[in-house]
C-alpha cells in the first residue's frame, strides 16, 4: 500500500536532469536550479515516511546553504583551508585541483629539458649500448692466464721459459716415472708453480727426446711394420698351399696313365 500510494501521487516532483550539452570536458555536472531545492514536498509523501522512520527534529525545518556553513578552525601551516572546497557564488565551485591542472602541463617540458641537458654530456652512450660487449672469456685464448693488457686480439702462443730449479725437478721425476698420473701431475704443478698443461707438454717433449736419443722406433711405425710382415707371411703360406694343391693332380694323372699301359 505504501508503494502504490507513493506511485499514484500526482504532485510528486520528478527529478530534472540537465541536457547533455551542459556537461563540460572535465565531466563536471552543474548544480540544479534553486527552484528544485526550494519547493516543498507533498504532505502525503512525508506522512508515509513518518510512519516508517521516526522523524528528526531539525531535518525538515532547517535549510542548509553551502555558503553559510561555518569554517572549522584549522591549524596554521596545514595547506589549503576547507573553504576552498565549498560552493561559492551561483554554483561556481572552487576546486583545489585547478592548480594541479595548471601545473601539470609545465612538468613535461621541465623533464624534457633535463633530458636534453643530460644527452650532450654522454653523446656516445646510445652508440655504445647498441654494440655488444665482447668479454675476454668469449674469445679463444691459448695462454693459461689472461693478460691484464688484453687488447681484444688473440695472442700468440708464448714459449714457457722454465727455470733451472724447475727443469731439475722435472728431470728427477722423469728419471723415475716417464708417464705421470693425474694426481702426481697436480702435485708437481703445485710444487713448481706451473700449470698441468705445462707439465704435460714438458713430459711429452721429454719422452720424444728420450726415444730419439735411444733410437727407439716410433710406436706408429712399429705397428705398421709388424702388420706388413704379417701380411707377407700370410701371402707366402697361401702360395705354398696352392703349389701343393697343383702338384697332387699331376701325380694322380701319371698313376692313371701307368695303369692304362699295363691293361693293354
Curated annotation (Swiss-Prot):
<comment type="function">
    <text>Sequence-specific transcription factor which is part of a developmental regulatory system that provides cells with specific positional identities on the anterior-posterior axis.</text>
</comment>
<keyword id="KW-0371">Homeobox</keyword>
<protein>
    <recommendedName>
        <fullName>Homeobox protein Hox-C4a</fullName>
    </recommendedName>
</protein>
<dbReference type="InterPro" id="IPR017970">
    <property type="entry name" value="Homeobox_CS"/>
</dbReference>
<dbReference type="GO" id="GO:0005654">
    <property type="term" value="C:nucleoplasm"/>
</dbReference>
<dbReference type="InterPro" id="IPR001827">
    <property type="entry name" value="Homeobox_Antennapedia_CS"/>
</dbReference>
<keyword id="KW-0217">Developmental protein</keyword>
<keyword id="KW-0805">Transcription regulation</keyword>
<dbReference type="GO" id="GO:0009952">
    <property type="term" value="P:anterior/posterior pattern specification"/>
</dbReference>
<dbReference type="InterPro" id="IPR001356">
    <property type="entry name" value="HD"/>
</dbReference>
<dbReference type="InterPro" id="IPR009057">
    <property type="entry name" value="Homeodomain-like_sf"/>
</dbReference>
<feature type="short sequence motif" description="Antp-type hexapeptide">
    <location>
        <begin position="134"/>
        <end position="139"/>
    </location>
</feature>
<feature type="compositionally biased region" description="Polar residues">
    <location>
        <begin position="115"/>
        <end position="131"/>
    </location>
</feature>
<dbReference type="GO" id="GO:0000978">
    <property type="term" value="F:RNA polymerase II cis-regulatory region sequence-specific DNA binding"/>
</dbReference>
<feature type="DNA-binding region" description="Homeobox">
    <location>
        <begin position="155"/>
        <end position="214"/>
    </location>
</feature>
<dbReference type="Pfam" id="PF00046">
    <property type="entry name" value="Homeodomain"/>
</dbReference>
<feature type="compositionally biased region" description="Low complexity">
    <location>
        <begin position="102"/>
        <end position="114"/>
    </location>
</feature>
<dbReference type="InterPro" id="IPR050609">
    <property type="entry name" value="Antp_homeobox_Deformed_sf"/>
</dbReference>
<dbReference type="InterPro" id="IPR017995">
    <property type="entry name" value="Homeobox_antennapedia"/>
</dbReference>
<dbReference type="GO" id="GO:0045944">
    <property type="term" value="P:positive regulation of transcription by RNA polymerase II"/>
</dbReference>
<feature type="compositionally biased region" description="Low complexity">
    <location>
        <begin position="223"/>
        <end position="248"/>
    </location>
</feature>
<dbReference type="GO" id="GO:0048704">
    <property type="term" value="P:embryonic skeletal system morphogenesis"/>
</dbReference>
<feature type="region of interest" description="Disordered">
    <location>
        <begin position="213"/>
        <end position="264"/>
    </location>
</feature>
<dbReference type="GO" id="GO:0000981">
    <property type="term" value="F:DNA-binding transcription factor activity, RNA polymerase II-specific"/>
</dbReference>
<keyword id="KW-0804">Transcription</keyword>
<keyword id="KW-0539">Nucleus</keyword>
<dbReference type="InterPro" id="IPR020479">
    <property type="entry name" value="HD_metazoa"/>
</dbReference>
<keyword id="KW-0238">DNA-binding</keyword>
<comment type="similarity">
    <text>Belongs to the Antp homeobox family. Deformed subfamily.</text>
</comment>
<feature type="region of interest" description="Disordered">
    <location>
        <begin position="68"/>
        <end position="131"/>
    </location>
</feature>
Amino acid at each position: 500500500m505504501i508503494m502504490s500510494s507513493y506511485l499514484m501521487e500526482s504532485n510528486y516532483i520528478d527529478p530534472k536532469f540537465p541536457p547533455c550539452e551542459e556537461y563540460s570536458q572535465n565531466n563536471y555536472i552543474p548544480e540544479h536550479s534553486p527552484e528544485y531545492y526550494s519547493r516543498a514536498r507533498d504532505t502525503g509523501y512525508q506522512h508515509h515516511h513518518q510512519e516508517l522512520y521516526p522523524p528528526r527534529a531539525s531535518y525538515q525545518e532547517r535549510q542548509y546553504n553551502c555558503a553559510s556553513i561555518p569554517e572549522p578552525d584549522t591549524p596554521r601551516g596545514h595547506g589549503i583551508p576547507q573553504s576552498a572546497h565549498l560552493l561559492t557564488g551561483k554554483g561556481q565551485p572552487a576546486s583545489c585541483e585547478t592548480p594541479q591542472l595548471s601545473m601539470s602541463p609545465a612538468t613535461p617540458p621541465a623533464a624534457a629539458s633535463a633530458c636534453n641537458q643530460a644527452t650532450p654530456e654522454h653523446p656516445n652512450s646510445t652508440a655504445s649500448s647498441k654494440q655488444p660487449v665482447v668479454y675476454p672469456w668469449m674469445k679463444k685464448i691459448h695462454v693459461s692466464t689472461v693478460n691484464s693488457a688484453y687488447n681484444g686480439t688473440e695472442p700468440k702462443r708464448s714459449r714457457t721459459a722454465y727455470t733451472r730449479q724447475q727443469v731439475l725437478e722435472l728431470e728427477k721425476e722423469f728419471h723415475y716415472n716417464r708417464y705421470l698420473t693425474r694426481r702426481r701431475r697436480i702435485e708437481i704443478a703445485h710444487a713448481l708453480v706451473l700449470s698441468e698443461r705445462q707439465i704435460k707438454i714438458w713430459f711429452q717433449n721429454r719422452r720424444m727426446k728420450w726415444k730419439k736419443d735411444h733410437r727407439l722406433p716410433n710406436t706408429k711405425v712399429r705397428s705398421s711394420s709388424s702388420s706388413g710382415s704379417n701380411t707377407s707371411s700370410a701371402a707366402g703360406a697361401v702360395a705354398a698351399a696352392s703349389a701343393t694343391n697343383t702338384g697332387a693332380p699331376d701325380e694322380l694323372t701319371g698313376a692313371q696313365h701307368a695303369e692304362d699301359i699295363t691293361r693293354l
